[in-house]
Amino acid sequence: MLKTPLKTLLDALTHHFTKERLVTLILTADEKLLIFMLEHENANDYKNAFFKMIANTLVFNQEALLECLEIKELEKSFTRFKNKIGLFSQGGFIKSSELVVLNFPFKDNVLLGNAKDNNTKSKELFYHEILHKKEIDTFLNKKALCHFEMHGEGDLENALKDKNTNYLIKGNNLIALHSLKKKFAKQVKCIYIDPPYNTGNDSFNYNDNFNHSSWLVFMKNRLEAAREFLSDDGVIFVQCDDNEQAYLKVLMDEIFLRENFVASIIWANKEGGGKSDSKHFRQKHEYIHCFAKNKEQTIIYGQAVEDIDRYKCSDKHENTRGKYQLVKLDSGSLGWIKSLDYPIELEGKTFYAGGDYDQWLDRQNGKARIKDWGWRWRWSKEKLEWGLKNDFIEIKENSNGEWNIYTKQYLNCDSDGNIKPRTLQPMALIEKHSNTQSNRHIKEMQLNFTYSKPEALIMDILNFSTNENDLVLDFFAGSGTTCAVAHKMKRRYIGIEQMDYIETITKERLKKVIEGEQGGISKKYGFKGGGIFVYAELKEVNLEIKRQITNANSASECLKIFKTLNERFLKRADCKIDEIDSEEFQNLDLNEQKRICCTSLDSNEDYLNLGDIDEDAWEIDEITKKYNEIFYS
């Protein structure tokens, strides 16, 4: 934290140099300006705010000082737009451009997002990235963990030392991400999140009443942090509905870069005709935007063939290749290529793609309209020779007495002869796995959560993007579907959830998974239970006190809790207890008294910084300190 407020530092500069002259001095890195700051009585604060260390050398950060000065005057801050939202380029709003960034109110802020339950609709706290840089650094420092629990066989200490351990963390997900990012940076293969959709209602168990700009800031902060977790070949899937999906896509273009966009998957999530609560179109789908950390290194895995009844034919290779189906070698819809339009002589017969010699001759002589008669073979001459040699080709007469060449498409062998289950390239359309299925599953587990995602949907996503033992992250863990599916599919996982139901729903669900519950994808994967996860919570400080104040039943109880606080908890140095003792305060209703007491507490200290864990005031026991040391080592 700065000992001197930024406003004081800026006022000293503008008083000494004048505002107009100061801008020129900053742009030219004038020696007089640098000497003034470095020899000032608040030199350390000037260094912390407007200089940075590069290769052990103190370097003047002109941009930081300029931005801070300009924001002080409210001339160039994004917040000047207030309620305007649009696409922004080269200093102004635009309708279209090759290069765009999403512009929205409070873009240069960090939104804490401290919802704890559905019933509390609190005003969310913004921190400005420039004017509150030090405050941001403080609340995004590593936080101490507490209430460690081991679930499954084994002991907690060894689990914390094991890099393959699964984790379920309770706490604000933005702060948790920043606490965990150094430990898990560049290790996560797949991130899946199902954030609040900004629907303006309580259709599921989130404090889902952000306004548009708040929601965008909320997502921006978390996506920027999440990107640091992804491995170079990692991918992120973000689920959304029509309320924000278009803005979310452009926001993700900015954070992950447009060239790393993979797909916008459509999931038909409702059975039957969909919801009819719109006067225009029925809604029965949601979106899942997928981006890669580096698209050049990312592999999207194919889906296993489900319609195996089509594979009816058998030959001498069945034990290794499995059964097969026949697929005609020629095609009229793949686009004509002259080198793939050649005559084939087999078993005393000559074959032409499309079956017509005259059309073939016209194609060769340039007389045919290729778009009408663009037949050709799917395999080259060399590939055909390989297929004949390795028994991948079959000639067969159809019911009309016509002979055709077919390739054998085996169930357990690819077209290059590699023995492995056949897969299909996944489609960006999922027309299965409804919310009805997931709601039924949740009820079977005797858990109370609305609109949990079906396990089969998350199974598809993890099949697209991961292999066994890959690490999966979900920082909107909700009812724990992602963690449960990862557990059953032998993936490692980290789940983060700040809502209080993590203890009664999310954690309880994962305990049932370890016990071997048979809903969802359990039977498909032959899952019988087992495995472990570690539960822990970010250590609350002011959050715990705020909760006590909120739950107080009387004004006297509220004041008693507040008055026992050490002065370190107070948000402002000029906040005086005697003002709370005033008659004016006493005349306020209880809820207003609670609000004033809670807002007087510094949100920087909602959670305990790891660096402060040894201070006696926090009364952290030695075993908890030890577990933190092991976890963060």
Regions found by a protein language model. Give the residues of each.
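Coupling/switch/interface segments within P-loop NTPase motor domains and analogous charged loops
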Residues: 12, 19-135, 379-386, 390-402, ...
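Class I SAM-dependent methyltransferase "Motif I" SAM/SAH-binding loop
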Residues: 476-478
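Charged, amphipathic alpha-helical linkers/stalks
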Residues: 536, 544-583
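Glycine-rich SAM-binding Motif I of class I
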Residues: 200, 480-484
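Cysteine-dependent PTP/DSP-like catalytic domain, specifically the C-terminal lobe
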Residues: 267-276, 460-469, 488-548
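Hydrophobic/aromatic ligand-binding patch that stacks against planar heteroaromatic rings
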Residues: 228, 484-485
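Class I S-adenosyl-L-methionine
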Residues: 72-471, 503
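Extended, Lys/Arg-rich, non-catalytic nucleic-acid recognition/anchoring regions
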Residues: 1-18
